[in-house]
Amino acid sequence: MILQLFAHKKGVGSSRNGRDSESKRLGVKRSDGQFVLAGNILVRQRGTKIHPGANVGIGKDDTLFALIDGYVVFERKGRDKKQVSVYPERKVAQS
């Protein structure tokens, strides 16, 4: 009886690397103080890294968008959270 052993791996071929996914283009799309129209996307994100504030809606993929025409304001929400709001008038910094 003759026993023939074969290699587990194929002897030749390309490497098993060389794949990458397409970038998702996430991040802040409108900056603080910028005028936006209702429906404009403010932030594209995965999870609620930034929370919706006044006059801001949230999509099923956690995208934040303006509900009214106005000015974008990034604010703190408590100690460790951020939120973005849209106000009809520009907020003036108090001195």
UniProtKB/Swiss-Prot annotation:
PROSITE patterns, A to Z: RIBOSOMAL_L27
Q: How is it modified after translation?
A: The N-terminus is cleaved by ribosomal processing cysteine protease Prp.
Looking up InterPro entries in the UniProt record yields:
Ribosomal_bL27 (IPR001684), Ribosomal_bL27_CS (IPR018261)
Q: Which residues belong to the propeptide?
A: 1-6
Cite a GO CC annotation.
cytosolic large ribosomal subunit
Q: Name one Pfam family in it.
A: Ribosomal_L27
What are the BP-aspect GO terms? translation
Q: Which domain of life is it from?
A: Bacteria
An example of a GO molecular function for this protein is: structural constituent of ribosome
The protein's matches in Gene3D superfamilies, at most eight in alphabetical order, are given as:
2.40.50.100
UniProt keyword list: Ribonucleoprotein, Ribosomal protein
UniProt record similarity statement: Belongs to the bacterial ribosomal protein bL27 family.
Classification via NCBIfam families: L27
HAMAP family this protein is in?
Ribosomal_bL27
Write the protein's name. Large ribosomal subunit protein bL27
Q: Organism source for this protein?
A: Caldanaerobacter subterraneus subsp. tengcongensis (strain DSM 15242 / JCM 11007 / NBRC 100824 / MB4) (Thermoanaerobacter tengcongensis)
